[in-house]
C-alpha cells in the first residue's frame, strides 16, 4: 500500500513535466507561426501596392493589362496564404490556451 501512495505523486509529476515540455514546444511553434504571419503581412501589403500600381496602368496597353492580371493573381495567392496562416495560428493558440488551462488545473498548486 505504501508503494502505491508513493508512486502516484511521482507519476503525476512526470505527467506534469511532460505536459510542461509539450506546452513549451507548442509555444515555440506558435511564435514561429506568428513571425511567419507577420512577414507574410508585409508581403501581402507590397503585392497589393504592386497590383494597385499595375491596375492604374491597365488601359495603356495589352502588356500593362497582362501585368495587372499577373500582379492581381500574385496578390490573391498571398492573401490566401495569409488567411491560411492566420487560421492556423488562431487554432493553435486556442488549443494552446486550452492546454495551459488544463495544465494549470492539474499541475499548478497554490
Predicted regions and their residues:
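Short, solvent-exposed mixed-charge patches
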Residues: 14, 109-110
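Immediate post-signal-peptide N-terminus of mature secreted/exported proteins
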Residues: 11-60
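Amphipathic alpha-helical coiled-coil segments
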Residues: 30-37, 70-107
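Flexible coil/linker segments and helix-coil junctions enriched in charged and small residues
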Residues: 53-74
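Bacterial N-terminal signal peptides
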Residues: 1-6
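Alpha-helical interaction segments
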Residues: 41, 65, 92-94
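A generic alpha-helix preference that emphasizes hydrophobic side chains
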Residues: 8-10, 100
